[in-house]
């Protein structure tokens, strides 16, 4: 299927690793040009170098949890070109007891996981509506509808992203602009690999055995009983950004291997 993404310009926040980087590669393979983003210029430059063989890659480093850096970032993006597709992927998580999470940490979760998407969307959604064309995808999580007791702040922010997406989608009524959220489940990324290695060590098990048993013990409702790959999630992101998904708007698209036991 030709997704008709050639010559589209895609901005993906938090795209120097994990799902964001996989999505950047997938968009490039479909013929789109991509702007990658990370906090550090060196990681942005490295990502550009790694992906440049697949197509046209631009980069803009910024910490989007900070208002001033986000504003400068948006100016730089506008200098690169007119965005057709915005993927708000920036986010982080930490496993921590609820009672131990400080006010400062709660604020950090909100600034990184929610306000980064608000800042970019607040600028680019009106521009998309003005030209009657565009896609916004907010990368949430299955934790947004099935909150995780060991990651309550993270879960809260992902619920907020789902609500943000639906609210913005209501603003697109009758236009050719769509806004959707994507809800990955357990996905194998660099960050997850690091966490699992640490958890296996703490449990006194080798990593391979620990990972093999993880779904049986911790995620028994998963229907695929494995981690999704970042590429599998990226495939859904790219499809929703295409004209082939023009009738899909305001949804929270699950890519969680059936882990949520509801219709």
UniProtKB/Swiss-Prot annotation:
GO annotation terms (biological process): lipid metabolic process; monocarboxylic acid metabolic process
Keyword Ligase carried by entry: no
GO MF term set: oxidoreductase activity
Binding site for substrate: 141
InterPro entries: NAD(P)-bd_dom_sf (IPR036291), Sc_DH/Rdtase_CS (IPR020904), SDR (IPR050259), SDR_fam (IPR002347)
Active site: 154 (proton acceptor)
Binding site residues for NADP(+): 13-20
Keyword hit for Oxidoreductase: yes
Annotated EC: 1.-.-.-
Name assigned to this protein: Uncharacterized oxidoreductase YvrD
Gene name linked to the record: yvrD
